[in-house]
């Protein structure tokens, strides 16, 4: 008989799914279905196009950052790597946090870019995204401090956690000796339990490449930083517009400010989530947050389900296909 391996992530995913079903049942499945039946598919398609455009923007930003370092990378490969990164983010605990290392690793394989340099590009991306996100969410938290929100303490805790994590990473980068000690200890631990060969020379070489590229970033001109920030902000704007379009698909008019606030709250709530892509936690917070803005629970639940389709299910499928293509390309390179 074939044995089925059940992981902790699978169990958590099932529990989260059942929890969402319970919330849907409490709101009224018949009410939610009634709202979904009247969905305008044209707006959903537009939302999906925006989702693809977000990936294009992320790819353009990454290519720009790589170009700053004096390297050239094929846009198709970068786009596939971004899709693969989204796939990995969607199947790992918390939100938007698991795919960067894989993207950097496969970038070095596909484009023959030094590993340390490849990792520095995704670190710069992460710092940009996190800084902009923390800045925006600080205003949202301030708004809810004044107006009141049931889960305000949870949001503040998530913000502090993300800020602290970012500060620790920046502190490690600023202290080369400490970073080397940390990376070597983690590498030894991983190699011990994952049957990888520990090569300290390669690790130290990658760290040196990483620092050389970070120095290069530090000396860049202002306009190049502005372009990178602009593309990062555009990514968030497109994400918010995508969610707003899903309301229009249900013929429900809602302010962009409301959608922006809930979008940021939902991302923030997923920081402390232990389920893949914040599944369950983020959905619950999204429904409750929209309800706090006096949006009918049935509409809030319907939009949440549509958002999962557009922002989670379809990108996960595309990301998996992208990962298969990337692995095939790498196998071809090995065969040459």
Curated annotation (Swiss-Prot):
Record-level GO cellular component terms: plasma membrane
Parts of the chain that traverse the membrane: 9-29, 40-60, 68-88, 127-147, 154-174, 223-243, 245-265, 285-305, 306-326
PANTHER family reported for this sequence: UPF0104 MEMBRANE PROTEIN MJ1595
Record flagged with keyword Transport: no
Disulfide bonds: none
Source species of the chain: Methanocaldococcus jannaschii (strain ATCC 43067 / DSM 2661 / JAL-1 / JCM 10045 / NBRC 100440)
Membrane disposition: Multi-pass membrane protein
Localization (cell): Cell membrane
Stated family: Belongs to the UPF0104 family.
The protein, known as: UPF0104 membrane protein MJ1595
Domain of life of the organism encoding this protein: Archaea
UniProt keyword annotations, A-Z: Cell membrane, Membrane, Transmembrane, Transmembrane helix
């Amino acid at each position: 008989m074939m044995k089925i391996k059940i992981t902790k992530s699978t169990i958590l995913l099932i529990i989260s799914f059942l929890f969402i079903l319970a919330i849907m049942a409490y709101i009224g499945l018949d009410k939610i279905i009634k709202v979904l039946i009247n969905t305008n598919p044209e707006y959903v398609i537009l939302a999906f196009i925006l989702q693809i455009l977000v990936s294009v923007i992320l790819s353009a930003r990454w290519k720009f950052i790589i170009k700053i370092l004096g390297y050239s990378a094929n846009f198709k490969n970068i786009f596939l790597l971004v899709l693969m990164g989204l796939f990995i983010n969607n199947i790992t605990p918390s939100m938007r946090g698991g795919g960067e290392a894989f993207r950097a690793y496969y970038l070095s394989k596909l484009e023959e870019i030094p590993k340390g340099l490849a990792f520095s590009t995704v670190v710069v991306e992460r710092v940009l995204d996190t800084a902009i996100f923390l800045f925006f969410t600080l205003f949202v938290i301030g708004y809810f401090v004044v107006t009141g929100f049931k889960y305000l303490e949870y949001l503040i805790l998530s913000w502090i956690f993300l800020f602290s994590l970012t500060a620790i990473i920046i502190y490690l980068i600023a202290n080369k000796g400490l970073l080397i000690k940390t990376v070597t200890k983690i590498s030894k631990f991983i190699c011990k339990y994952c049957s990888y060969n520990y090569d300290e020379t390669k690790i130290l070489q990658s760290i040196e490449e990483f620092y050389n590229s970070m120095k290069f970033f530090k000396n860049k001109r202002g306009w190049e930083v502005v372009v990178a920030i602009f593309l990062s902000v555009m990514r968030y704007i497109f994400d918010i517009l995508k969610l707003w379009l899903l309301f229009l698909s249900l013929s429900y008019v809602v302010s962009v400010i409301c959608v922006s606030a809930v979008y940021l709250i939902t991302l923030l709530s997923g920081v402390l989530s232990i389920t893949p892509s914040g599944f369950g936690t983020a959905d619950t917070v999204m429904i409750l947050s929209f309800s706090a803005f006096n949006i009918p629970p049935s509409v809030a639940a319907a939009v949440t389900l549509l958002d999962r389709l557009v922002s989670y299910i379809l990108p996960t499928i595309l990301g998996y296909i992208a990962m298969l293509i990337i692995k095939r390309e790498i196998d071809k390179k090995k065969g040459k």
